[in-house]
Amino acid sequence: MQLMLFNLFSPALKLNTGLAILSPGAFEVHSDGIDVDNELFHYPIKKAYTPYNIHTYKTEEVVNQMNIKVKNMTLDEINNTYCNNDYYNQAIREEPIDLLDRSFSSSSWPF
């Protein structure tokens, strides 16, 4: 429920694929995480906080392969690049928000 409310009342775009993408200007990247609307989300995945989505999990392997950068991309570019290909199925799954434990393993996926 908290995840749904965030997607409805925030600067994130909810795509029909289930991928919530931050709109440009909605975040600031810091050395210890991503600040979204003054709320800090921590990513203990090297320094690969490619600021594209704070509410989905990706494996480290796919993050490194894709080197995702969407801050200046249009919604169509994001859809065409990240949502209409094989990477989507292997990389992106939504999970509940948990600020204390950020796990990036596929075993944490709810499916």
From Swiss-Prot:
Q: What is this protein called?
A: Putative protein YddJ
Which species is listed as the source? Escherichia coli (strain K12)
